[in-house]
Curated annotation (Swiss-Prot):
Keywords, alphabetical: ATP synthesis, ATP-binding, CF(1), Chloroplast, Hydrogen ion transport, Ion transport, Membrane, Nucleotide-binding, Plastid, Thylakoid, Translocase, Transport
Name used for this protein in its record: ATP synthase subunit alpha, chloroplastic
A molecular-function term among this protein's GO annotations: ATP binding
Organism from which the protein derives: Pyropia yezoensis
Lineage per the UniProt record: Eukaryota, Rhodophyta, Bangiophyceae, Bangiales, Bangiaceae
Catalytic activity: ATP + H2O + 4 H(+)(in) = ADP + phosphate + 5 H(+)(out)
GO cellular component terms given for this protein: chloroplast thylakoid membrane; proton-transporting ATP synthase complex
Gene: atpA
Membrane topology summary: Peripheral membrane protein
Length: 504
């Protein structure tokens, strides 16, 4: 019989115990109680954070939004068709964040910054939280540099500065996206990074935007974030925050950035859908009580940073769609009160052939005039006054049959001024040419030209300034003023064009 030596066995057991090294991984696990309509109710997950990312068995990602005593309300970032009742859910311990980097320029990504343009994964320089804090009061400085849109009516009367939030508001099909895209196209060569966020739009519309930016050579400095109409409500809700996070990466590197949210009405509707399905109490127009905070925390991230933080800026152009011109609805009034001004696009003006269809009377820029260049200030003040008087006279003259000569002259000048503000889509005008156009109009040089010929005259004047008198543009660009030398050149150009022009 073999002798069993207890000391040998005990030493073997001791060695086994000493070698035993099992890493214990503690996971926060819950169970799905109910799933449907892009919402899951989960039992367990005792240590979950608000806004934490959760992973389901089928690898779908969700966000914990409602933390209740007996369950957690989770919104899904996928269709959730393969999530079963009773399946497990794992807490990741992370708040939603996205990769960021210079390689994202020229790319089309989804709200989680995953590429959707079949060009491969962009190299990232790190990550940023989708929801990050807006810069504080001390970290900001007042708006002091212009953000030229290339649209004469806006740059002269409703100027936008870098770091401003300017709302573009109007009914559907009034040219809101066109104004935003023209602004992106006009940033070519200005060292501005643009981010276009498409929320709840048709994929065909987004494809159209991409191709028009590509044609104009503007895609190289633009990032497009697209949450299409068929995307889950959760992705439509986070898309604007993703756009802001991508822009913040460049802003904190000292760059000027421009973000367009097209449009925030769709984001509010997606958030309303999620809130109602989570059984949060509805408020006005069935929106949840925190829908103001939804937009204010997004738009407060736009800023002009002070020199210590690098002097970068984020300019926000949110778009809001109104119903039958009703700006007193809930979402429009909220966003108007958050932003630093609004550009109101009117359906009636659009249909009567005035494009861009900007209603100058109720459009306003609260801080942009501080950023306007001196040359534009010299001519724009008179333009706004003349147009306001013209609008008043035009309404009055519809009832009067015989008008005195002065009134007729004022009406004639007003019609010509309105004509010079018309502009084709995707053809932004440099600020020095805008100054020349307005100067020509307000100083009566167009009064003897037929209204139908004004556009042709302006086109010839721009050609003459560009080809025969390039020093005019150089002077205005370098001095930012309309100096007597430049004024003389402009007057000569007007005379030269008039000589060979058929006015009638």
């Amino acid at each position: 019989m073999v002798n069993i030596r207890p000391d040998e066995i005990s030493s073997i057991i001791r060695q086994q115990i000493e070698k035993y090294d099992q890493d214990v991984e503690v996971a926060n696990i819950g169970t799905v109680l109910q799933v449907g309509d892009g919402i899951a109710r989960v039992y367990g997950l005792d240590e979950v954070m608000a806004g934490e990312l959760l992973e389901f068995e089928d690898k779908t990602i969700g966000v914990a939004l409602n933390l209740e005593s007996d369950n957690v309300g989770v919104v899904l970032m996928g269709d959730g068709r393969d999530i079963l009742e009773g399946s497990s859910v794992k807490g990741t311990g992370r708040i939603a964040q996205i990769p960021v980097g210079d390689a994202f320029l020229g790319r089309v990504v989804d709200p989680l910054a995953r590429p959707i343009d079949d060009k491969g994964e962009p190299a990232s320089n790190g990550t940023r939280l989708i929801e990050s804090m807006a810069p504080g009061i001390i970290g900001r400085q007042s708006v002091c540099e212009p953000m030229q849109t290339g649209i004469t009516a806006i740059d002269s009367m409703i100027p936008i500065g870098r770091g401003q939030r300017e709302l573009i508001i109007g009914d559907r099909q009034t040219g809101k996206t066109a104004v935003a895209l023209d602004t992106i196209i006009n940033q070519k060569g200005q060292d501005v990074v643009c981010v276009y966020v498409a929320i709840g739009q048709k994929a065909s519309s987004v494809a159209q935007v991409v191709s028009s930016l590509q044609d104009k050579g503007a895609l190289d400095y633009t990032i497009i974030v697209a949450a299409n109409a068929d995307s889950p409500a959760t992705l439509q809700y986070i898309a604007p925050y993703t756009g802001a996070a991508l822009a913040e990466y460049f802003m904190y590197k000292g760059k000027a950035t421009l973000v367009i949210y097209d449009d925030l009405t769709k984001q509010a509707q997606a958030y309303r859908q999620m809130s109602l399905l989570l059984r949060r109490p509805p408020g006005r127009e069935a929106y949840p009580g925190d829908v103001f905070y939804l937009h204010s925390r997004l738009l407060e991230r736009a800023a002009k940073l002070n020199a210590e933080l690098g002097g970068g800026s984020m300019t926000a152009l949110p778009i809001i769609e109104t119903q039958a011109g009703d700006v007193s609805a809930y979402i429009p009034t909220n966003v108007i009160s958050i932003t630093d001004g609004q550009i109101f696009l009117s359906g009636d003006l659009f249909n009567s052939g005035i494009r861009p269809a900007i209603n100058v009377g109720i459009s306003v820029s609260r801080v942009g005039s501080a950023a306007q260049i001196k040359a534009m200030k010299q001519v724009a003040g008179k333009l706004k006054l003349e147009l306001a008087q013209f609008a008043e006279l035009e309404a009055f003259s519809q009832f009067a049959s015989d008008l005195d000569k002065a009134t007729q002259n004022q009406l004639a000048r007003g019609q010509r001024l309105r004509e010079i503000l018309k502009q084709a889509q995707n053809s932004p005008i440099p600020v020095e040419e805008q100054t020349a156009i307005i100067y020509t109009g307000i100083n009566g040089y167009l009064d003897d030209i037929e209204v139908s010929k004004v556009a042709e005259f302006i086109r010839e004047l721009r050609e003459d300034l560009k080809n025969s008198k390039p020093e005019f543009g150089e002077n205005v660009r370098s001095t930012k003023k309309l100096e007597p030398v430049s004024e003389e050149l402009l007057k000569r150009a007007i005379e030269d064009v008039k000589q060979g022009f058929d006015k009638a």
